[in-house]
Amino acid sequence: MDNNNNQRGISFIGSIALLVSAMTGPGLVTIPLLFQISGWLIPTVMFLVAMSLGAISSLLLCEALTTVRGNDHFQRKIELTHLTNFLIPQKKTRLIIQIILYLSIESVIIASIILSSQAMDLMLLRWAGKTCGLSLHPNLGFLCVKDAIDGNSPFGSSYMLASLGFVIALGFCAPLAFLDLVDNMIVQILSFGTLAFIVIVWIGTFIITGLHKDYVPLIGSNQSQVVGTVLFNYAFVTTVPSWVNDLRPDVSIRKATWYSVIITTLAYILLGILGGMTYKMDLASNIIAEIDHSSHRNILTDIATFLFPLAVLLTSIPVYSIVVRYNLERSGLCKRKMAILLSTLLPWIIVLPFQSGFWLNIFTNWTTLLFTSASNFIIPFYLYNLSQKQKNQISSIEIIELAEKDFETSTLIITSSSASATPPPSVPPSSPMLNADKIDKKTLPNVDTKNIIEKATNIISNTTDNDNLLHPNRSLHYRSNRSNENINDNLIITPTSPTTPISPISPISPTLPILPSSPQYPSTPSTTFSQTKSFIAFPASRQCRMMVAMVAGIISIILVGGIIIYDFIKLALGSNEFDLSANS
């Protein structure tokens, strides 16, 4: 039964489908315009930089997760918000970061709901000839439109309570959001296959239509949109902890991560360069609009246009809802019912009166700018740095414990040997040697070394004795990433008792947890667990990984800080434009 549970995890193909889905969205159709106005050199370089930052941030975050005591192989299912409880002792700082993480993912869900609802209404308008909804302002009542109005929504500036597109999106996403992440993998794999079909059809259409090199210069006249448009397409890092917690044992985290970002980057660059060379686009245009008005429109392009909102936009909403629920529930912030309310129902309620107009778009853009950027490209590097510092703090505790164990072992050997040896000659009752022991006991303090070590450990790690106990009804799933194979192996071990400690040291532990005296399965060698290693971001020394984390973190801060400053300057100058991708 345990083996079946292991195989129920997310597969390698499912991992790629999940991560690619998190990195692709409505921004996919606007990339050719970016290459036309900015040239192909700087956007291509920025895509490579963003790809590297996203992958490094994800892998370092995974390594930080394994430093939590008892989570060496992701067996405790520690989520991102839960990780802050272990690494950040300051309550105010921890609360601020948790709020940023929550608002980041919620803003992505809200933006995706808006874009998906609008896309469904436009699809109905295209294929059914009209779409309808319940209007709140300026006219209260049922409203139907037959022609698309300029803007993102077919209803223009009218404020809608609900539209047919919203109902379709809700009916598709809500049932999937109540499932677990593993149960959504079939939908994600189908979405990935559909996305591949769409990209192939578009590229084929570009080639048939004809390419014009002069449409995409080496360096364009406007570079202001490059960083924001490219960087936020890789804002998938917040989904990584939930993914690795449900990962199957035979899946390599490194390979899945790098394959996903490389596939996504190639799709963006190919669509950007080839699409930009095919059509001369204005600032309000995109790939779908240009193909629809081209002479090479055919049944395949119509199918691709029909499937795009379904495969690319809708399928990401349940994933982010599940990630929010996991973070709230697994970290103990709230119970399951409240977690479902906050993750699945609340975003749809917030969106109801704001499906059209511009106020929610402004809110979404700024929350994406401030929260999504920090949670994906700054906080992961910060948490990794904290995890490595905590490792240094507990090294002295490990040395003390090792010395204590050696002392106890040597004492046991001496006691055993003395018990089997010839007893010493008896001492008369009046001998002063008998009183010496009493004198020593009075003069020497009664020191309990083990209690001192435990108290010191709790002080350093900011934990209590209750944190050292494993839940009695929970099994441990050990996943290792061998440096020579890059493959994770899971084995299941049930604690010997409800009070079996996870680790003798702090919540952040680079060593393996205490294991039962014998494995659960007789066929498993007794040396399996002593030979497994915790996951590391990439095969390099710890100093090298910390250096990479520092450099990548500095680059991320410079890029994100530059975008924020740039947009604040634009706002001060009276501009309502934002240097952001449409894909949150």
Mark where each language-model region is.
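Membrane-interface "cap" regions at the ends of multi-pass membrane proteins
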Residues: M1-L33, G54-L59, K77, I400-S416, ...
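Alpha-helical transmembrane segments of multipass membrane proteins
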Residues: M46, L53-S58, T264-L271, L346-I350, ...
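Hydrophobic core of alpha-helical transmembrane segments in multi-pass integral membrane proteins
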Residues: L170-C173, V199, I203, L345-L352, ...
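Intrinsically disordered, low-complexity proline-rich tandem-repeat tracts
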Residues: A421-P432, P495-P522
